Amino acid sequence: LAAQDYGLTARTRWLEAPAGRARQQNAGARSAAGEAVWFLHADSRLPARSVAAALDFAGDEGLGYFRLRYLADGPMPARLNALGAGLRSRLLHLPFGDQGFLLRRVTFEALGRFDETLSGGEDHALVWLARARSVPLVDLSMPIFSSARRYRDEGWLRTTLRHAWLTVSQARRFSAMARQRSP
């Protein structure tokens, strides 16, 4: 997030954390001072209206997420993947981390933060746990733009098939984990 684009530079600072996305996101959450935590990927871009929606939602109950769109830095079919992410989010209630998770700190802590024992899919695991604990998943109905360069660099079909396989295999694993960790 280019915080200066939104007048947020006074509240933005750089920090270093050990390798691993879960560790890094948890370190960011620990260092944050607000009542809400907002997790964005480094290549995320948000229009001003999306930032406004996030600021309006911050502090509300639930796990908020945005509608994924891809930048024009990848192949045209990547737009189909963005449509698929929207369907997955709305129909299966499975938004992923590239959709910019926003939730109250107390909710994040109650969910146990991102699971640092996982080698990947920590965002997926958090969503399954939120669902198991009846935390509402809230579509903020605003776009978030991410790079499609992986589809360009690694091939659209190969990347799409790998993501589909990961989604299914992680869903089986994380849904069972979430049931075990829920009251």
What are the functions of these language-model segments?
Residues 48-77:
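Conserved donor NDP-sugar-binding/catalytic core segment of glycosyltransferases
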Residues 41-45, 49:
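The conserved acidic donor/metal-binding loop of glycosyltransferases
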Residues 37:
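Short aromatic/hydrophobic "clamp" motif used to bind/position activated sugar donors
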Residues 16-32:
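Glycine-rich, basic loop-to-helix element that forms the pyrophosphate-binding segment
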Residues 120-126:
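Acidic donor-binding loop at a coil-to-helix junction in glycosyltransferase catalytic cores
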Residues 1-19:
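Acidic donor-binding segment of Leloir-type glycosyltransferases
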Residues 128-183:
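Hydrophobic helical membrane-anchoring modules
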Residues 33-34, 98-111:
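Conserved nucleotide-sugar donor-binding
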